[in-house]
C-alpha cells in the first residue's frame, strides 16, 4: 500500500484539479448527461467514418461530385448543431416566467415597494414562498404572478390547490414539476435523457427540428450504406461490419421517424406527451372526452404559435368552448377552415 501511495497522490491531485476546472464533472447527473452527449456525437462520427474508411468508390464519387458530399456534411453539421442548441435551450421554467411578471409589475409600483421587492428578490425562495404563501398570511394579497395564474382557472379556484409541493410556486395550466430538473416546466412534454433537459413550451419547436434533421440524416446515410453493399463484392468482415451498422441505423431510423410523426401530431393538435399519456391523472382534463383537444386553436394557429414563438399561457377552456370543440367537423366546417 505504501508503494502505491506515491502514484495515487499525483492522480488524485490531477483529478481534483480537473473537477475544479470543470465543475460539471463533479455532479453525477451532469456527468452522465455529458457522457451521453459525447456518445451520441461519437456514434454519428462512426457511421460516416466507416464509409470513408471502407468505400474507396465513395471517396472517388466525392471527388467527382463534391456538391453531393458537401450537402451531406452540411446536413450532418446542422443536425449536431441543432442537437446542442436544443440541449442548451430552456424549456420555459415557471420561476423565470414568474420573475418576468413580477419585474413588469414592479415598474408600476411606487419606489418604496419596488426597493423592498428588489431586496427580497436576492433570494428566489423568499419571493416564492413568502409572497405565494397565501395560506400562512391570509391577509396578504396574492402576487402579480398568483393573480395571473388564478385568472387562467375557473372562478373559485383556490391558490393552495395550484401550488407545487416541491418548489412552492403557483402552477399555470399544463405545468408539471420535473424531478430531474427539480423545477416546474411550462407546457411540460417530457424530460429527454439524451438531451439532458426537459422539452416544454420554449424548446418544443427546436426539438421537432432536431428530430426532423436527424430523420433526414438517417435516411440519407441508410441509402449510402445500401449503395455500398450493392457494389462489387468486398471482404466478408467489411460486409459484416457494414451490415451490423446498417441494422443499428435502421432501428434508429424507425425510432426517430415514429418520434417525428408523433410530435408532429402533438404540435398540430396543441398537446403534449404528458397530457396525452397522463390525461386521466390531470384533474382539469379528467372529465374531458378523449377526442377533444382542450387547448387546440386549429391547425394553422397551433403551427403559428409553435413556429413564431408565441409563448402565451393557456387558460382552461369554458364549457361552451369544450362543447364547440367536441362537435364533429362537417363539410361546411371544412370549407370555412374551422379545423384550421
From Swiss-Prot:
Induction: Not regulated by salt stresses. It catalyses: L-cysteinyl-[protein] + hexadecanoyl-CoA = S-hexadecanoyl-L-cysteinyl-[protein] + CoA. One of its GO terms (biological process) is response to salt stress. The keyword Membrane applies. InterPro entries: Palmitoyltrfase_DHHC (IPR001594), PFA4/ZDH16/20/ERF2-like (IPR039859). The keyword Acyltransferase applies. Keywords: Acyltransferase, Lipoprotein, Membrane, Palmitate, Transferase, Transmembrane, Transmembrane helix, Vacuole. Disruption phenotype: Pleiotropic growth defects, including smaller leaves, dwarfism, and sterility. Hypersensitivity to salt stress and compromised pollen tube growth. The chain crosses the membrane at residues 34-54, 66-86, 207-227, 241-261. Its EC number is 2.3.1.225. Residues 162-212 form the DHHC domain. It comes from the Eukaryota. It is a multi-pass membrane protein. Its main location: membrane. Pfam families: DHHC. It is found in: Vacuole membrane. The active site is at 192 (s-palmitoyl cysteine intermediate). Expressed in mature embryos, embryo sacs, cotyledons, whole seedlings, hydathodes, guard cells, sites of lateral root initiation, root tips and phloem, but not in xylem. One of its GO terms (molecular function) is protein-cysteine S-palmitoyltransferase activity. GO terms for cellular component: plant-type vacuole; plant-type vacuole membrane. The DHHC domain is required for palmitoyltransferase activity. Belongs to the DHHC palmitoyltransferase family. S-acyltransferase involved in protein lipid modification. Catalyzes the palmitoylation of proteins peripheral or integral to the tonoplast. Required for the tonoplast localization of CBL2, CBL3 and CBL6, but not for the plasma membrane localization of CBL9, for the endosome localization of RABF1 or for the endomembrane localization of RABF2B. This is Protein S-acyltransferase 10. It comes from Arabidopsis thaliana (Mouse-ear cress).
